């Protein structure tokens, strides 16, 4: 016979999968219209010129171009804004 007592059960051992948020296209990268730039919860990064925002706060490019991030001050807070500038062909 096996000489092992029954082990207790644990209430741990679960973990949810990550939601893959974050910056998807960085400053200086070329993007196409519709490309996702940032996936976020709330407005960590604000939309700038030629950037749209989806209803889940996803930022996306409205035109083909180059990504540029910018810090700016509003009400004594430093915020981040992302722009897409038209690429010179």
Curated annotation (Swiss-Prot):
HAMAP family: Ribosomal_bL27. Pfam families: Ribosomal_L27 (PF01016). PANTHER family: LARGE RIBOSOMAL SUBUNIT PROTEIN BL27M (PTHR15893:SF0), RIBOSOMAL PROTEIN L27 (PTHR15893). The gene is rpmA. It comes from Desulfovibrio desulfuricans (strain ATCC 27774 / DSM 6949 / MB). GO terms for molecular function: structural constituent of ribosome. This is Large ribosomal subunit protein bL27. Residues 1-26 are annotated as: Disordered. GO terms for biological process: translation.
